[in-house]
Amino acid sequence: MANNDQKRDEGYIEKLVQVNRVAKTVKGGRIFTFTALTVVGDGKGRVGFGRGKSREVPAAIQKAMEAARRNMIQVDLKGTTLQYATKAAHGASKVYMQPASEGTGIIAGGAMRAVLEVAGVQNVLAKCYGSTNPVNVVYATFKGLKAMQSPESIAAKRGKSVEEIF
């Protein structure tokens, strides 16, 4: 597979996850359009995904990249891994992600790997169950990452210290 990640001048890492051709049948024949799914991140915990549609592939990718930049979230990482094991689902896709020790690398497949790479996660064990549709896997991965909170943020919300929580 080609290396689909690029670094832009803003410091974002961009990855193309999927390009899909869709055909609409009309009286005169078929009209082909393309949809692109991309993920964008800064490698330090900020990550976003976007979808773009157009009659040409480059235009669809460009629209998806712009949508991904507008749709960015901040993920609370614990160094180069996740805070704790988490599960999430979207549609028939279910994902499970758990932190891993230093040197493990990203053990994840397909669309989930792209999201974790651009987010800056370097050590993680992840598995996708059910449907492996890239769109649903990306949505589910984002749900899991978005729901994850650091002990510091939980302590701040409760008005306690981190030691009091544990």
From Swiss-Prot:
The keyword Cell cycle does not apply. GO terms for molecular function: rRNA binding; structural constituent of ribosome. Pfam families: Ribosomal_S5, Ribosomal_S5_C. Keywords: Ribonucleoprotein, Ribosomal protein, RNA-binding, rRNA-binding. GO terms for cellular component: small ribosomal subunit. The keyword Ribonucleoprotein applies. Residues 12-75 form the S5 DRBM domain. InterPro entries: Ribosomal_Su5_D2-typ_SF (IPR020568), Ribosomal_uS5 (IPR000851), Ribosomal_uS5_bac-type (IPR005712), Ribosomal_uS5_C (IPR005324), Ribosomal_uS5_N (IPR013810), Ribosomal_uS5_N_CS (IPR018192), Ribsml_uS5_D2-typ_fold_subgr (IPR014721). GO terms for biological process: translation. It comes from the Bacteria. Belongs to the universal ribosomal protein uS5 family. Part of the 30S ribosomal subunit. Contacts proteins S4 and S8. With S4 and S12 plays an important role in translational accuracy. Located at the back of the 30S subunit body where it stabilizes the conformation of the head with respect to the body. The N-terminal domain interacts with the head of the 30S subunit; the C-terminal domain interacts with the body and contacts protein S4. The interaction surface between S4 and S5 is involved in control of translational fidelity. This is Small ribosomal subunit protein uS5.
